[in-house]
Each structure stands twice: as C-alpha cells, then as structure tokens.
C-alpha cells in the first residue's frame, strides 16, 4: 500500500521519463515537467544550432571589391585605407571559415589580420570600423584605451572590452567570438620613452601588455556584471582567437619620427633630402619602427600586421561628406524638415563655409554635425510653427552668422 502511494507521488520528466530520484532536479510547468538533464541537453542543441547559424553567415563574407563598394556608399575619401581594411576583413573571416572546415591533419596556421589605423581626429577611423561591422552583420564594440588600466589599479580592466561585445551580441558567446572590437586612442597609452621605466606605468606599457593577450588570442574570464573580478563572481569564458581587433589613434607627432628616419636614410646614401609638404604624405610612409619609437611595444605591433593610414580630410572631402554618402548630414536634415512639408537647400558656398569651420576647429568630419546644429537651431525651432513656409535656403552668411536663412512661403 505504501509503495503504491509513493509511486503516485513520484514526479517524472515529461521528456525522458526519469523520475525525481534518478535526476538532480525536476522543474514543474503547465501540465509538464522537465529534468535538469533534459534542460542541459536542450541548451547544447540550441548552442550547436547557433554556432551553425553564425558560421553560415560568415561563409558568405563579401569579397574585398564588394566590401570597398559598401564602404564607398558611406565613407568619402581614404581610398588606400578602405582597400587595406577590405582585404584584412575578408582575409580574417576567410581564415575563420578555413579553420572550421579544414582537416585536422593540415598544419597551416593562419594568423589574425588585426588592424592598426593611424589618422588625425575626425578622419573617419571609428566610422570605417562601424561601417564594416554593420555590412558584415557581426557584433561591434568600441573601447577607449585611455579608460583602461593595468590589473590591480583603479580603472577598467581590458576584459570589460569583451563584456561590451557580449552585451551587443545579447550574450550569445558564439556570435561575440566572431565580432569586431575597435580600440580607440591607442596612441594615448604609448610609453613615454623607448627606455624601460623603473616606475610602474599604470596606463602605458602595462595596459599594452594586457591588451596584447586578448588581441593575440586567449580564453578570457569576463565578469558578466562588469567591474573588478572577485573570487565569488561567476565568469563567462570568451575565446578571442577569432575576434577581429581594429586599433586606432591620431599619433600626433609621428610624422616627425618618419621625417627623421627618412632624412637619416637619405643622407646615409649621399642624396639630398626631398621635403614633403603635407604630413599626410609622411603618414603613408609609416613603418613598424616608427610606431615603436612613438611608444607602442613591439609585441603589440607584431599582433597588428595591417597598417591603414588615413589622411587629413580636405575642404573638398568635407563638402562631399556633407552631401554624398547614403546617410549624409544634409540628407538627414532635409528628411527632418520634410516631415513638416518644408524643403531644405544648402548653397554650395554654405557647404564650403561649414567645411572651412571644421578645418579651423581641427575636428574633421566629426565636427560637421555640431556646426550644422548651430546653423540650423533657429530654423528647426521656428519653422515647424510657420505653416506657410515651404522652403528654407541656407547661405554662406547663414553659416557665418551674418544673416538669417532665406525662407520662401506658399
């Protein structure tokens, strides 16, 4: 009798049929039960399917020419840098596909094509990286190198960079492990000199060493809530071997290092040193030796085999950026006013003046939006309430503040 009562009270998994004494735990649902073993099996099936989906997406990576075509829709100028990035990104994801499909007996080990982008503020480094990630539909995260500190010091651990990527990937580890991370302002953590310092370098060489580990490929322990690690915290294991790292910085003054090197070599051969007018010409001549002299450790340089030098944008470049890309600023403001049934026009001289202001402020393309915001503030405030206005024309005088925009009414 007691045995039958016990069987009546026994709970069974609705999927595998095991009872509560045969498994660690059984979870009750609406008219159904599931044991911990079936939960683990379901998680494994889902994980495998997600990996297959990620690999399937990456198997259709656009060719370099196709990537360049995509970049040209959004990014003006920087043709050499765009070509270098297109090739590096294509080779990176081709390497992943090759690694996942090759036979175990093959001994070819393709190294990662991590990228170092060097160029002045506002030249498009971050935007290039963002556009590439968007075109490939892979998770993308941005980190500021100046916020990072060596382990044991107050500040942000390098592992928190990986946490940002995980968050963008909705904590899908497999997707995150094939994402792109852009580390900005790497030049700001350069060593102060080529000589090894006796004192601790909290935000310089120590951070470079910490970055080196995750850039070259390692299994990192990432705190899911961010912040500092502590023994009681459960960690997420992230393998960085297939994460593409794009590292960028302005490297102000590196052209002087290039000039010095080129001058010494020319004199050594008994030739006259030919002066180059623009610093951008020197930027195209940068080699690993110059970057090391600037203060980046040679081990980190070795893990960034692709150099992409971006040039200072000219007034003509900035004017094209204002009106040509698919998401150009002029098009954005025209769209905003169109919602109020108002057309917006910029005179050519107005666009030139906006570009000139950005050059004067040394903000490059990054500063264009703030200049347009200043110019358009009164228009955006007043025009929506003026029902008879049908067209707004922005002139050079509007931009330099000497006159108001021209309004045409119905």
Curated annotation (Swiss-Prot):
ATP binds at residues 120-127. Belongs to the ClpX chaperone family. Keywords: ATP-binding, Chaperone, Metal-binding, Nucleotide-binding, Zinc. PANTHER family: ATP-DEPENDENT CLP PROTEASE ATP-BINDING SUBUNIT CLPX-LIKE, MITOCHONDRIAL, ATP-DEPENDENT CLP PROTEASE ATP-BINDING SUBUNIT CLPX-LIKE, MITOCHONDRIAL-RELATED. ATP-dependent specificity component of the Clp protease. It directs the protease to specific substrates. Can perform chaperone functions in the absence of ClpP. It comes from the Bacteria. Zn(2+) binds at residues 13, 16, 35, 38. Residues 1-54 form the ClpX-type ZB domain. This is ATP-dependent Clp protease ATP-binding subunit ClpX. GO terms for cellular component: HslUV protease complex. Disulfide bonds: none annotated. GO terms for biological process: cell division; proteolysis involved in protein catabolic process. Pfam families: AAA_2 (PF07724), ClpB_D2-small (PF10431), zf-C4_ClpX (PF06689). GO terms for molecular function: ATP binding; ATP hydrolysis activity; ATP-dependent protein folding chaperone; protein dimerization activity; unfolded protein binding; zinc ion binding. Component of the ClpX-ClpP complex. Forms a hexameric ring that, in the presence of ATP, binds to fourteen ClpP subunits assembled into a disk-like structure with a central cavity, resembling the structure of eukaryotic proteasomes.
């Amino acid at each position: 009798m007691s045995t039958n009562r016990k069987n009546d009270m026994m709970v069974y998994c609705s999927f595998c049929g095991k009872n509560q004494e045969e498994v660690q735990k059984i979870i009750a649902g609406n008219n159904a039960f599931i044991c911990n073993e079936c939960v683990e099996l379901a998680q494994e099936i889902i994980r495998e399917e997600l990996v297959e989906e990620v690999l399937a997406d990456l198997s259709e990576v656009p060719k370099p020419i196709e990537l360049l075509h995509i970049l040209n829709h959004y990014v003006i100028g920087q043709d050499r840098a765009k070509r270098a990035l297109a090739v590096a990104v294509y080779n990176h994801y081709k390497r992943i596909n090759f690694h996942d499909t090759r036979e175990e007996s093959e001994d070819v080990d393709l190294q990662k094509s991590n990228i170092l982008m060097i160029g002045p503020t506002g030249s498009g480094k971050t935007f290039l990286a963002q556009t590439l990630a968007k075109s490939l539909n892979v998770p993308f995260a941005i980190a500021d190198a100046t916020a990072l500190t060596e382990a044991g010091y107050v500040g942000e651990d390098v592992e928190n960079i990986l946490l940002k990527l995980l968050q963008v990937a909705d904590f899908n580890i497999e997707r995150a492990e094939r994402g792109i991370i852009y580390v900005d302002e790497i030049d700001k953590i350069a060593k102060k000199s080529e000589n090894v310092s006796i004192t601790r370098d909290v935000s310089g060489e120590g951070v470079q060493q910490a970055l080196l580990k995750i850039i070259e490929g390692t299994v990192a322990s990432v705190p899911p809530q961010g912040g500092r690690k502590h023994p009681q915290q459960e960690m997420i294991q992230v393998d960085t071997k297939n994460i593409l790292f794009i590292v960028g910085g302005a490297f102000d003054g590196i052209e002087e290092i290039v000039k010095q090197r080129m001058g010494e070599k020319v004199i050594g051969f008994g030739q006259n040193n030919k002066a180059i007018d623009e610093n951008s010409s020197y930027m195209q001549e940068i080699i690993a030796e110059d970057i090391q002299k600037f203060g980046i450790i040679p081990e980190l340089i070795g893990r960034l085999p692709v150099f992409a030098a971006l040039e200072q944008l000219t007034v003509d470049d900035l004017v094209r950026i204002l009106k040509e890309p698919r998401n150009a600023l002029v098009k954005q403001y025209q769209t905003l006013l169109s919602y109020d049934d108002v057309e917006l026009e910029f005179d050519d001289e107005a666009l030139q003046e906006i570009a000139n202001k950005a050059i004067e402020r040394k903000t490059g393309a990054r500063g264009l939006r703030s200049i347009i915001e200043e110019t358009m503030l009164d228009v955006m405030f007043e025009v929506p309430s003026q029902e008879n206005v049908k067209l707004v024309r922005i002139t050079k005088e509007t931009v330099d503040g000497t006159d108001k925009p021209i309004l045409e009414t119905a």
